Amino acid sequence: MKKEKMIAFSFSLFLGIITWFTLATSVRKGLPLLDASIFEYFGYAMSHGQRMYLDLFDHKGPVIFLINYLGYSIGASLGIKILYLVSLIVFFYIGYYISRLFTGIRNSFVVLVITFIIFESFFEGGWGLEGYILPCLTYSLYIFLKYFLEDKINKYEIILSGFSFAVVLFTKANMIGIWLIFSLLVTIKLIYQKQFSIFLKYIALFITGSALFIVPLCCFLWFQGSLKEMFYQSVVMNFIYSKGSGYLTVMEMIKWYMNQVNVLQLNLMIVIAMIAVWKQYGIKILFYNGAFIFCLMLALISKRAYLHYLIVLIPLFIPYISVAINKFMNKSSLLCFLIFTIGLVFIYWGPIHGIKD
């Protein structure tokens, strides 16, 4: 077990380092028109005494202000980049364990490589807020999946899931789809089984985890005098932005999304996964599909065709990819493994070449 954890971490570190070299070298020079340049300025301004929501305006939640402030305090733009790298390493590491719920060790490393390719295809030079919260999304998805597949969950896992929920909520509220849909499923399951005491216990633990982040944050904002402005800018203004008229219609957004994921063969993998596990999981796969569609709707709600908006869906792709890979690579023969791996290189030749460039 320890050896597997060490190998998984080392491979996650390797993928993180590769991502480091594909990041824009400078937010201000490399990404002048994206939000990342604004985020870096937040870090600079706050390190020079300016206050979020009072001296600085944005419709994002306070987490992105604090992350860039912390990163800038560590080492200016390099410090921000280091925090982004750490977030990605944790994301890949947890993603490995999501894959392990559905397939073996060897296949899970293949899944991580595909996950890396998908991330590189979506991240638009990096530094965006979606990358920082990937560990929270991925960890909570892992906990929910483990609970439904193995009926196992610990107190600290629920508390950490609640904490992760609060972090994402105060980053960008339309990214909390995983908690909304899976919490509903947990509620239905426990009420149907008449496990009311366990249900109340889970609620208390989840609220405790959320409060561990929300209470100190709100106290800080209150003492700073920006609590009211935070709610106005990050909730009211963000709702106006999300519901504002994007330049694409709903059908155009769906078409755009389908084009992006079809290039990466993701829809094909979803279909293969659904067929492969129907006998094993039955209606559970339909519930998972519903959760995925709900999160997709939230990601595209602004009707703006930004690839980095799709980053929050990557953790949800991992189970599909894992099942699909397991379907085709379940032979113990090393030759079969090598042949299929070479085949994947040809399938992803375009995205791989794009990463190289």
Predicted regions and their residues:
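Hydrophobic/aromatic-rich transmembrane helices and adjacent perimembrane loops
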Residues: 177, 296-298, 302-333
